[in-house]
Amino acid sequence: MQKHEYVNPVKLYSAIRDEKFPFILESAEKSGRARYTYISFNPLYTVRVGSRTRVDGEVISKISDPFDALNEIHVKGLLVGYVAYEAVKNYIGKKPQTPSVFGCYDGYFVYDHYLRKLFSVNVENADKIVERAKRVEVEQVRGNSEVLRAGSREKFEKMVERGKEQIFEGEVYQIVLSREYVVDTDLSPFQMYLNLRETNPSPYMFLLEFDRALIGSSPETMGRVEGNSFIINPIAGTARREAGREKEIAEKLLSDEKERAEHVMLVDLARNDVRKVCRAGSVRVSRFMEVVEYPSVLHIESEVVGELKAGVTHFDAMKATFPAGTVTGAPKLRAIELIDEIEGDCRGVYAGAVGYFSENVSDLAIAIRMIEFDGKARIRAGAGIVADSVPEREFFETENKIARVLRAVGL
């Protein structure tokens, strides 16, 4: 490990972003989840898991579950990428339309923000890269953007009614339904990231410029393995933030029976997921129903922790909780089937997971508050539907969640 003079992370990323498969996983909020930032490029190899598993483009197996595929490859190094929500199609007898993609990196830069230090691990010409980064000028650009398509209020409210019908029929207790914006923009993924970093800083900021680019600011941990501990951070319960009224809004949010019921249901689901891979008696709720403030919304958050059973890999642990109950509903499998039926389109990466695996620590955020860019910017937001949901209210919840992400593309 080599120590370097501190340079702004976005300047360092800008200095390497013309290389292959560059990424930045950045902490942009002062919390326990906001200590480290990772930057790298030029992976040793890439892994794509769709209907088959490919390494550097070559088919190596017929495995279509990304967690099973990564277990089989026996990865050495830092594995960074995303598991597309579409991987859930494996659970309902369909083929994923969007592949899950990872790069395996043997060298990387890492920031420790508590110590305000920058290190490199096995990066060739690291000093030269850092010196080049010091000279980089980073400028935010608002750009020109146009909404090509947006999930209409009328359509979404009809979806909510269909979801409620399934709840009344006893199919599910809760279902999370989403809607999508498609935006034409002249902004680059990096420019969108700079804007999002300003408008919606979160514990999990990410920019992955792979075959498609992912630009995101997720508040929510899908799963984290640290040593032998497995941690899930369910977030459910949302209110729009208004300056000067945060305490009042938080109290109202915590006293809302619908929001409380939804949150408790998803904490129970998280406990069940953690129990699948953790020692009996080790699972506990370490934080329960705390209101956390974000730039545009307030969320109710909890944390579930357990100790992994012997022989459970990091990939096994993440598979146990994928996809997160907070983006599907409960019971999870039936909710997934109904989402496929009611939404009727491809979620892509949205509601999947983004992050990294390493030997000692692995950390995946839920792929929300994000832009998926493949020539057009695709932005989704969802709301949890329960028996007493009001369609109009659920529509505006999606609007509140998506507002700051739209600002990142100049809207």
From Swiss-Prot:
Catalytic reaction equation(s): chorismate + L-glutamine = anthranilate + pyruvate + L-glutamate + H(+)
Regulation of activity: Feedback inhibited by tryptophan.
EC number: 4.1.3.27
Keywords: Amino-acid biosynthesis, Aromatic amino acid biosynthesis, Lyase, Magnesium, Metal-binding, Tryptophan biosynthesis
Binding of L-tryptophan, residues: 27, 203-205
GO process terms (BP): L-tryptophan biosynthetic process
Residues noted as binding chorismate in the record, renumbered to the chain: 237-238, 350, 369, 382-384
GO MF terms held by the record: anthranilate synthase activity; metal ion binding
Domain of life of the source: Archaea
Cofactor dependency: Mg(2+)
Pfam families: Anth_synt_I_N, Chorismate_bind
Family: Belongs to the anthranilate synthase component I family.
Functional description taken from the UniProt entry: Part of a heterotetrameric complex that catalyzes the two-step biosynthesis of anthranilate, an intermediate in the biosynthesis of L-tryptophan. In the first step, the glutamine-binding beta subunit (TrpG) of anthranilate synthase (AS) provides the glutamine amidotransferase activity which generates ammonia as a substrate that, along with chorismate, is used in the second step, catalyzed by the large alpha subunit of AS (TrpE) to produce anthranilate. In the absence of TrpG, TrpE can synthesize anthranilate directly from chorismate and high concentrations of ammonia.
NCBIfam families, per database record: PRK13572.1 (NF010087), TrpE-arch (TIGR01820)
Protein name listed in UniProt: Anthranilate synthase component 1
